[in-house]
Amino acid sequence: MEKITLAPISRVEGEINLPGSKSLSNRALLLAALAKGTTKVTNLLDSDDIRHMLNALKALGVNYSLSEDKTVCTVEGVGGAFNWKNGLALFLGNAGTAMRPLTAALCLKGSSEAEVVLTGEPRMKERPIKHLVDALRQAGASVQYLENEGYPPVAIRNSGLKGGKVQIDGSISSQFLTALLMAAPLAEGDMEIEIIGELVSKPYIDITLAMMKDFGVKVENRNYQTFVVKGNQSYLSPEKYLVEGDASSASYFLAAGAIKGKVKVTGIGKNSIQGDRLFANVLEAMGAKITWGDDFIQAEQGKLKGVDMDMNHIPDAAMTIATAALFAEGETVIRNIYNWRVKETDRLTAMATELRKVGATVEEGEDFIRIQPLPLTQFQHAEIATYNDHRMAMCFSLIALSDTPVTILDPKCTAKTFPTYFTEFEKLSERT
């Protein structure tokens, strides 16, 4: 297996321009494909998850052209539901941001009835989709499970979404609601979506609503309990759509600056629509010096202390706090993060296991993780397993800010969101 060893870093300093956001890139491509008109999507992320979405759209008859560096995509919208030849199968890797929204969009009524199968890597078949399918069926959709009940692969007929009152469970993943919201304007009738349970990762819903608005569709949001969407609408191309830099990817660089130096990330700023920008507030609460601009966030080293916080609103970036916590004074508790368990891997167990390898004292709860700090000289050199999870690989690069090297197995798994991560991290790293 491939691996990379990072030697101890004495200081990090510099500026990094972030690649486009994964969540925004795949939403933008799907909305552009469903819209009337042609959309030029810029600062698109070039990564595995985006490639899976692009391949699926091509198979569904969507025409697009991609720039040589794959960051500009001009999409010719089909102006409504997709049409395809019966018997199509789409392989979506481990891309939740493609699987969930496409599951909903492919239920929309096509000009002639056809079936499509959505499948992916073995891990995708372990990632739940039941809450979304239950909701789609209430709206009249035809979706069947082909292997395990409640999980992909699924077979979908484009027999239409009728609208009406639909209840959806919001307690596991906000992607289910995002998928339903994005398909709802193209349903045959108005849809009233009621949330069952506590809606997790609310800021990701804000992203969805903001982007739908950019494509000409307004949703009535009643305090995140009920969402009302008029049916029989069309998305309209905004002609150009700029994808913000990935705020989750920013977290590693900001944390590095907070621990040992000064780092400025560009491509997101104080007006970003991504909830993960609020990661910087957590670093600030820990003692880092944070500066906000319209198009940048800068983190500078401060005396870090542990925090005890609910991080349900920033689940992806919260992982970075788990490794940063080792460099703080006092224990850190990250709470209300059950949905770590249904991501690329079970991130709660993975994080606890790998932190212990470097010498940390960790308590793993059902929906929380408690981490004790570690003196710089007491880190142990370990080989970190990454579980084919891009965020595990990136989080553990921070261990090199101690006095000990760290070895990361399968570093190329960062290709899911940030293929050049280790090169960029290296550019900011100074060694004595």
UniProtKB/Swiss-Prot annotation:
Keywords linked to the UniProt accession: Amino-acid biosynthesis, Aromatic amino acid biosynthesis, Cytoplasm, Transferase
Record-annotated active site: D316 (proton acceptor)
Disulfide pattern: none
UniProt pathway annotation: Metabolic intermediate biosynthesis; chorismate biosynthesis; chorismate from D-erythrose 4-phosphate and phosphoenolpyruvate: step 6/7
Residues annotated to bind 3-phosphoshikimate: K22, S23, R27, S173, S174, Q175, S201, D316, N339, K343
Stored InterPro entries: Enolpyruvate_Tfrase_dom, Enolpyruvate_Tfrase_sf, EPSP_synthase, EPSP_synthase_CS, RNA3'P_cycl/enolpyr_Trfase_a/b
GO CC, one annotated term: cytoplasm
Catalysis performed (reactions): 3-phosphoshikimate + phosphoenolpyruvate = 5-O-(1-carboxyvinyl)-3-phosphoshikimate + phosphate
A Pfam family that the UniProt record links to this protein: EPSP_synthase
UniProt-annotated location(s): Cytoplasm
EC numbers, comma separated: 2.5.1.19
Domain of life: Bacteria
GO BP: any one term: chorismate biosynthetic process
HAMAP family documented for this protein: EPSP_synth
The protein's assembly and partners: Monomer.
Family: Belongs to the EPSP synthase family.
Its job: Catalyzes the transfer of the enolpyruvyl moiety of phosphoenolpyruvate (PEP) to the 5-hydroxyl of shikimate-3-phosphate (S3P) to produce enolpyruvyl shikimate-3-phosphate and inorganic phosphate.
PANTHER family noted in UniProt: AROM/DEHYDROQUINATE SYNTHASE, PENTAFUNCTIONAL AROM POLYPEPTIDE
Protein name: 3-phosphoshikimate 1-carboxyvinyltransferase
Species the sequence originates in: Actinobacillus pleuropneumoniae serotype 5b (strain L20)
Lineage, highest ranks first: Bacteria, Pseudomonadati, Pseudomonadota, Gammaproteobacteria, Pasteurellales
